[in-house]
Amino acid sequence: HTAGKSVGNYCYTRDAVMGILLLLVKGNDGEAYTVAHPEAHITIGDMAKMVAEKQANNEIKVVFDIPESAMTFGYAPDVNMRLNSDKLQALGWKPVIGLEEMYTRMMKSMEYTR
């Protein structure tokens, strides 16, 4: 019921765990750190299109068919939040897996569990 314009930030699970473990060793008490891949931010709509293209080989398409009554449902407004992990990277953390590879790995793991 939205146009998918909100921006989300993502981080591969292994990269996130490595960041958290690094914080346990090198992080400063009382400090806040952000664990997010600096290049893995994308709108929900663009993510859906990427999955349709890259993971479904363009066999599906993304359609936004938003009823006029959707505004009465109380959905949150679109957000454009780009998280900054510079502080964590200054401690030596570097994410390895990019957004497309995250989805490729997730889809392969879902096929394996069928």
List the predicted regions and their residue ranges.
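C-terminal substrate-binding subdomain of Rossmann-fold SDR/epimerase-dehydratase oxidoreductases
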Residues: 1-114
